[in-house]
Regions:
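A short, N-terminal "cap"/entry segment at the start of jelly-roll beta-barrel domains
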Residues: 1-43, 127-147
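Conserved short histidine dyad/triad with adjacent acidic residue
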Residues: 32, 47-62, 96
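A short hydrophobic beta-strand segment most commonly corresponding to one strand
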Residues: 48, 93, 107-125
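A generic "binding-loop/recognition-motif" signal
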Residues: 55, 63-64, 82, 98-99, ...
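Short beta-strand His + acidic residue motifs that chelate non-heme Fe in jelly-roll/DSBH
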Residues: 57-59, 77-78, 94, 100-106
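Short acidic-glycine-tyrosine-enriched beta hairpin
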Residues: 81-96
Length: 147
């Protein structure tokens, strides 16, 4: 099967553009497209997330590792106690149980491909108490206050 890419809308033929999450997790201006949802011999899900300028993904952690490749634009990624600038083409490995978040805080869309196991644990949203502790790091404080 081939799913043709539409560069204008950053969508793929036959793939629905969905709300990022349905579980009331905190996020802003993020959509999700599931490009591949597993097969018997490839038990992974391949997804595309698009964050509008000023938006951000949920700050979370989980038991599973996942791989992310920046596909569009630039922004920043929080991983544990560090904040990194990311741009198109960058590959990111997010280890299990590492707090992480993506922000489109560079005036552009931030689109990324994400590979995870089909069978995986549920995310653990980083609590406001944990975020308050993390904000003691000036770089993380600036990241969390950025748009």
């Amino acid at each position: 099967m081939i799913r043709k890419f539409n560069r204008e809308g950053y969508t793929w033929d036959g793939v629905d553009t969905l709300v990022y999450k349905q579980d009331n997790s905190p996020f802003k201006d993020v959509t999700r497209q599931v490009l591949f949802d597993g097969a018997w011999d490839i038990p992974c899900q391949f997804r595309y997330f698009e964050v509008k300028p000023g938006g951000y993904s949920t700050m979370e952690r989980h038991e599973h590792t996942h791989m992310v490749m920046i596909f569009r634009g630039k922004g920043q990624c929080l991983m544990g106690d560090t904040v990194e600038d990311v741009q198109e083409g960058d590959m990111i490995e997010i280890p299990k149980l590492m707090a992480h978040q993506f922000r489109a805080n560079q005036g552009e869309h931030l689109g990324f491909l994400c590979l995870v196991n089909v069978d995986r644990d549920k995310v653990q949203v980083i609590t406001s108490e944990e975020q308050a502790m993390m904000k003691q790091n000036p770089a993380i404080k600036a990241f969390l206050e950025s748009e």
